[in-house]
Amino acid sequence: GDRDGNPNITAEITTDAMELQVSHAIRVTIAAMNALRQMLSVSTKIVGATPELSASVEKDLKHIPEFEQRFLRLNAEEPYRLKATAIVHRLAFTRDRHAKGAPHVPNRDYANTAELLADLVLMRDSLLAHRGELIATGLLERTIRTIAAFGINHATMDVREHSDAHHNVLKQITGIDGYIEKSHDEKFEILTKFLADDVRFDTSQLEALGKKTVDTFVAINNLIDRFGPEAIETYIVSMTKGADDLIAAVVIAQQAGLVS
């Protein structure tokens, strides 16, 4: 996300990087769940399950018809393994949704890491309530901690840009004579009024560097829509000398729909 002074870091590169890290994170998480699934052969003939887990498995079976019938027969009395299998399916659906740019489907794929963690915690709590402490506090707990740390996005991306890049855009789209030469206080007053009045500008005629800056904000908005707010949480403005340097970025973010 660091494009400060680097012309090669475009909106497309940022999007590609996010897609790559999310794909990697989901692939690793699926592998972890498959390993966990092999350990969860606990039968209800020996160890029970909470009503919450049983209800969750029933809901999974309703929304995931792709469950192989042989697994349903073999694991009919193994709710923990069925739940782990459902999680693998939902992770695969999440990966496919991201690849296609399709909308989230509740109970089919995961909207965010919190939904995945809720499923894992449900399994852990059920195991703890039914003499399954060994696996609940072992491999399952380690899996929960790993996913809580990295999420299904692998990492939160920071985006960084030089303050001059934002003022360059505003010089072009506002058409204000001598904009760059104005003092920090003058720019701050102008920009805060733009924000307060929700002024919209035509960004279609920007020169290449200005378009690159605006495209970055559009890409951030799209990535947050696709991967959730945890995908990108921080935008860093370098070489700031006044409050106007920060407000300038916010005005452009407003044009991209990031700020209402």
Residue positions per predicted region:
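Extended, well-ordered protein cores
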Residues: G1-A11, Q21, S163-D164, K241
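Beta-sheet entry/capping signal
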Residues: N6, I144-R145, I152-T156, E230-Y235, ...
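Extended active-site and interfacial segments that coordinate phosphate-rich ligands
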Residues: A11-A35
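Extended, charge-enriched "interface" segments that sit outside catalytic cores
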Residues: S41-R226
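Short catalytic-loop micro-motif centered on adjacent basic/acidic residues
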Residues: R131-L134, E233-V237
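Conserved short loop/turn motifs at secondary-structure junctions
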Residues: V159-S163, T234-G242
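A short acidic (Asp/Glu
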Residues: N168, A243-V251
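Secondary-structure transition/capping motifs at alpha-helix termini
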Residues: D225-A231, A253-S260
